[in-house]
Amino acid sequence: MTGAEAARQLLNSQGIYDVQIRQVAGSLTDHYDPRTKTVNLSESVYGSTSVAAIGVAAHECGHAMQDASEYVPLRLRGSMVPVVNIGAQLSWPMILIGVLSGGMGSPIVSLGILLFSLSVLFQLVTLPVEFNASARAVRLLDSTGILRGEEVGYTKQVLGAAALTYVAAAAGSILQLLRLIILFGGRRDD
């Protein structure tokens, strides 16, 4: 069974028939798009029969299941995207402009730090979304019999390792935010 076939079977098992499964170019490009209701699988996952590929496909289906059940953290994360994108683009330029024009304690620097904190919040909201999608994937792969025994355990390890990348990214962002607050927070150059 390929990643795409496993994805279709998992979605069907949950009564989700309105989600399309598509192959997308590149590697590590697997994602679920709630706007278009598509599970997008990279070339290396879509046609592969490896346990890892099936696990990745199942994880993306986990997001489709979250969408279908109106999982609150997924909705919250989706609603944050436009604001976070703007904040991510403007935070560092604001900090730099603030430092160059008004010094370390400039209100522009503070605004830049606030905008950066939106990205940190987004990453924190992402954690339960990713862990839940993986848990759903493992549970369904086991209950549907798509994977068995050691294969389920291996998939749990692969998805767990992938989830840790989100934890590491969030931790790095938190440390960067703390660094910005320590460097620039509350300072006045008057």
Listing of model-derived features with the role each one plays in the protein:
Residues 100-110, 186-190:
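Helix-coil boundary and interhelical linker segments in multi-pass alpha-helical membrane proteins
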